Structures are given as structure tokens and as C-alpha cells.
Amino acid sequence: MGQVLPLVTRQGDRIAIVSGLRTPFARQATAFHGIPAVDLGKMVVGELLARSEIPAEVIEQLVFGQVVQMPEAPNIAREIVLGTGMNVHTDAYSVSRACATSFQAIANVAESLMAGTIRAGIAGGADSSSVLPIGVSKKLARVLVDVNKARTMSQRLKLFSRLRLRDLMPVPPAVAEYSTGLRMGDTAEQMAKTYGITREQQDALAHRSHQRAAQAWSDGKLKEEVMTAFIPPYKQPLVEDNNIRGNSSLADYAKLRPAFDRKHGTVTAANSTPLTDGAAAVILMTESRAKELGLVPLGYLRSYAFTAIDVWQDMLLGPAWSTPLALERAGLTMSDLTLIDMHEAFAAQTLANIQLLGSERFARDVLGRAHATGEVDESKFNVLGGSIAYGHPFAATGARMITQTLHELRRRGGGFGLVTACAAGGLGAAMVVEAE
């Protein structure tokens, strides 16, 4: 085993995760239609502070993420500080690491705590797939810049005469990788073919995710960590996630056609996570600061790791790469874990990562390790369902997973939890958390 890297301050304090909260997650263009990510972020941070009863001046830093950014609010973190009644002097900056964005926000606050520059901070993320930065064509954009510099009406008219009707069409945000042009679903199809993952296996995992998420809500396990969202026109609040299919049968999944490879594919809308709106945040402190304030932490951050691989083939293998590093830095093995929570971008991606975590060949030939990371125990894996059921507001998912895992660990009497995700650009993230 490699070097253990304890996450402690210079005084020996552990990094405490005091509390966490999220909005309900809503499918694109449903309950949060027209609500920008910055407002979702304000909503969750404001409620998190109100519930914690922590004085606003205690929070010294806010690191927040947004993947689909809006030009009018490029620093969502600072807008949240200014819009929630927090101390105006609170340091705030924004981060983006695609689907692992709130992992990055949490790591950044943890690093500030370990460096001793702060003693308490908030980390999280928000995204809206319903309020999007709809752009213009490159040709129209160039003409508009030139028109702004033109001095006479004739010069302006000459510039506009270069445009064709197609140049005036709005341009939605790209859904493909900038470097390769591949959509996420194309990569999921690659992975299904590379690792021999069948349509039936993907549908079964998706069905499992929805069943377990529906059961978690039915059992009241998510009430403490999900706020009620009051949104314009304030006629009906959103209390629960609205993507979960609690009454579906496995046979229903087989009815859908492939969404990406129409002829030979196995990835469908039902075995993929949907476009989603929502926000999530956590409060982190040094262990001693939490004690001073009389707070009992949800748990502690034990380790984290980020990785990157090539984007052309099977790029959503982040968990298989980052998990062994995070476990190594925590001084743990897979068998030491009480819970494993993996982001389900696609059922194919999830199953591929599970397969590789237990692969001796992958460990030896690709990772350069002597042994496989370890088989994933199904009884520990995504026990409350995953992103296929809950949805995936890109920047919020990591904070959701960490809060959810810590609450479940406490219900089970404590232990260690692994939280891990793939991300666009071939990125991966993993964190080990501990509850007592």
C-alpha cells in the first residue's frame, strides 16, 4: 500500500462535515423551469444556514460550482454570498470540474481548513438545464462586434448584409466533448461494447436505482437532507425529487429505443441519468471549531483523489482510476468500506467501473498495481439508489452523494463510505468519508 495522507490541520484537527442539504432535484423544464442556477444556489445555502443556526460570520469561505454557466453571473459563489445575507466580507469563488464539481468545491474548502486560513466554510454546486445560455452563431457574433465598432450607418448595413438566415439561428449549449465531438452517450455506448455490458444488465441496474430511491423516500430517509422548495408562482412547493419512477416494472425499460446508437446501441433514456435542475451544499469545519460551537458533525472527510484519462475511448472510467488512490490515501481497502456510492451517469458506465474495480488485469496492465482494487459488494453499493433515479444537476451531485452517504452511515452505526464519480474530459473523483 502507498503512502497514507491524513487530512488534518496543523493542530491535528480532522475535517468535519457538519451538515448538508439539497433542493429536491427536478427534471429539465418541470418544477424549476425558469429558475436559474444562482437562485437554486441561494435557496439551498440560505436554508442550510437557517437550519444550522450558525452565525453568518462564522462562515469564512464559500466555494461553489456551476457547470452550465450563465454569462450574467460568472461567479455564482459570490452572488450566493451577496444574496443570502451572509457577511459581505466572506471570501467566495467558483469552480468547475464537470460532473465532479462539488467534489472539487469540497476539496478546496478542506485545503483551506488544513492550511489554517479558515476554520469554517461552505462548499457545493448548482445547475439548471432549464435556464441555458443560448448563444448565437460565430458569424453573427463577429458581425455584432464589428457593428459595435462601425462609425456610420452604411458601414453597419454592409456588415449585416454578409449574414444569411442560417446565421441568425440560436445556438444551444454543446452536449458533446469539445476535444472529440463525442456525446456522453456515445462514450457510454463505447463502454458497453468494450466491456460486454448487455441491455438487460443496464436496464436492471436502472430499475434497481429507481426502486431503491423510491424506497428511501417512502421510508423517510431523505427528509432531513432535502429541503422543501418554494418557487414562483408559489402555488405548490416541491417536496421530493420528481424523476423517480417508483411504480415502473423492469419490462417497461425494454420498450425504449436506443438513444445514441440507433441501430446497434443499448443505452436508452431510461438507463441514463436525465437532465436535471437542483443545488446542494455542505458545511465544513475543523473538528475543534465544531466543538466550540457545540455542533455534532455528520462525519469527517478521510481522503480524496482526482484523476484524468484519455477522452477518445471509454473516458468515463473515473471511479476505477480514482478509487484506489483515495483508498490508499485513507489507509483502507474495499473490504473496510461500509458503503459505496458511485455516480450513475449511465448504467453502462457504472457497470464498467464495477467490473474494472475487481479486475486483476486492469490493475496490473493499466494502473500498474499489484492487485485489483476489490470486488464491489452489491449489498453496500448505491443502497439508496443513484443518479439515474435522483437525476444529475451536474455541479450538485457530489454534495448530494456525500450528504446522503454520511446520513446512511450514521443510521448504520458509523463506518467508512466511498463516494466516487466520473466526469467529462476523462476526469474522475473519489472521496472517503467517515461517520461515528
Swiss-Prot record:
Q: Which CDD domains match?
A: thiolase (cd00751)
Q: What is its EC number?
A: 2.3.1.16
Gene Ontology CC terms, in alphabetical order = cytosol
| Signal peptide segment | none
SUPFAM superfamilies in the record, alphabetically? Thiolase-like
Q: Which reaction does it catalyse?
A: an acyl-CoA + acetyl-CoA = a 3-oxoacyl-CoA + CoA
Cited Pfam families: Thiolase_C (PF02803), Thiolase_N (PF00108)
Pathway given in the UniProt record:
Lipid metabolism; fatty acid beta-oxidation
- Which terms in the Gene Ontology molecular function aspect does this entry carry? acetyl-CoA C-acyltransferase activity
Q: What does this protein do?
A: Catalyzes the final step of fatty acid oxidation in which acetyl-CoA is released and the CoA ester of a fatty acid two carbons shorter is formed.
Q: Which family, according to the similarity comment?
A: Belongs to the thiolase-like superfamily. Thiolase family.
Oligomeric and partner information: Heterotetramer of two alpha chains (FadJ) and two beta chains (FadI).
Name the record gives this protein:
3-ketoacyl-CoA thiolase
Species of origin reads Escherichia coli O7:K1 (strain IAI39 / ExPEC)
